[in-house]
Amino acid sequence: MFTINAEVRKEQGKGASRRLRAANKFPAIIYGGAEAPIAIELDHDQVMNMQAKAEFYSEVLTIVVDGKEVKVKAQAVQRHAFKPKLTHIDFVRA
């Protein structure tokens, strides 16, 4: 079972995303179900180590946002073209 700590994003857009990536974080989103989508920011190194395992893509993950646990599955993962970096992940509620 994977547990990821996340924060709700305060800013959105290209500039805000670039600032996140410069701070070793990256943007993500949680959507699906009856609730509204949540734009979040994740720690790059924590998620990079988790996604190296194949189970990250097949198991239900737990994301802790503001103390509330959300069960999700990784839907789409975007990577940098030539650097070993994640640029964005879409999570769908499980």
Curated annotation (Swiss-Prot):
GO terms for cellular component: cytosolic large ribosomal subunit. Coiled coil: none annotated. The gene is rplY. Keywords: Ribonucleoprotein, Ribosomal protein, RNA-binding, rRNA-binding. It comes from Citrobacter koseri (strain ATCC BAA-895 / CDC 4225-83 / SGSC4696). The keyword Ribosomal protein applies. This is Large ribosomal subunit protein bL25. This is one of the proteins that binds to the 5S RNA in the ribosome where it forms part of the central protuberance. Part of the 50S ribosomal subunit; part of the 5S rRNA/L5/L18/L25 subcomplex. Contacts the 5S rRNA. Binds to the 5S rRNA independently of L5 and L18.
